[in-house]
């Protein structure tokens, strides 16, 4: 929308209309709804060079694996793998939100965002209480919390009318199916990510700084 408001037109639409690219044209192309390229066509031939400005907005996060949901010690968890350079110890007991899309078996795509609204639940990676973590606290920061420990707590309440195993896991799946119509198999075609929940806030009495998720590396796009 902002590109079009600044005079850029879709390259695909221009080609479909049989229009040729002319010097001075502003065109854009989108790939898989994830990347965007904008071109300001110059006057000189390409052999004389071009200016390229690149920026990315992907940020360190925890991506949900394809077969992520499991139950352990009467708790339901999501298995994740971290993306980007994260300090893993900073992600424990931090309120997390889940963002992404799920492509269902019928082809429908469901957008999922939970944890950002005040009425939403949040999620977290669990950690040991301080008086139970003597061994952990002897380790280095890099060793105290490992990537394998970055599992996200989803729930603890079991199905009451089921005497089988994994009752907490199935209770969570019932909630997901009720709200989004998704099944466990749909995780195979999902792109879901866990990020710190909460809006950007100003820092300091003078409000001179900003605290928010994603400075690395959305600031370069800004």
Regions from the language model: what does each represent?
Residues 1-222:
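N-terminal hydrophobic/helix-forming segments and targeting peptides
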């Amino acid at each position: 929308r902002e590109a079009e408001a600044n005079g850029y037109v879709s390259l695909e639409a221009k080609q479909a209309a049989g229009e040729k690219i002319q010097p001075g044209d502003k065109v854009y192309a989108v790939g898989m709804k994830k990347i965007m390229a904008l071109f300001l066509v110059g006057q000189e031939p390409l052999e004389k060079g071009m200016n390229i400005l690149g920026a990315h907005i992907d940020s360190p996060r925890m991506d949900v694996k394809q077969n992520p949901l499991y139950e352990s010690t009467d708790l339901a968890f999501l298995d994740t793998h971290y993306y980007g350079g994260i300090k893993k110890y900073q992600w424990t007991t931090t309120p997390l939100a889940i963002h992404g899309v799920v492509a269902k078996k019928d082809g429908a795509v469901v957008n999922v965002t939970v944890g950002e609204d005040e009425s939403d639940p949040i999620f977290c990676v669990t950690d040991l209480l301080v008086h139970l973590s003597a061994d952990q606290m002897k380790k280095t920061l890099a060793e105290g919390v490992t990537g394998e420990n970055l599992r996200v707590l989803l729930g603890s309440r079991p199905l009451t009318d089921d005497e089988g195993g994994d009752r907490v896991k199935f209770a969570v799946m019932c909630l997901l199916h009720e709200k989004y119509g998704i099944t466990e198999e749909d995780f195979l075609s999902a792109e879901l990510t866990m990020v710190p929940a909460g809006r950007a806030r100003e820092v300091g009495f003078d409000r001179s700084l900003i605290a928010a998720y994603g400075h690395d590396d959305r600031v370069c796009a800004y």
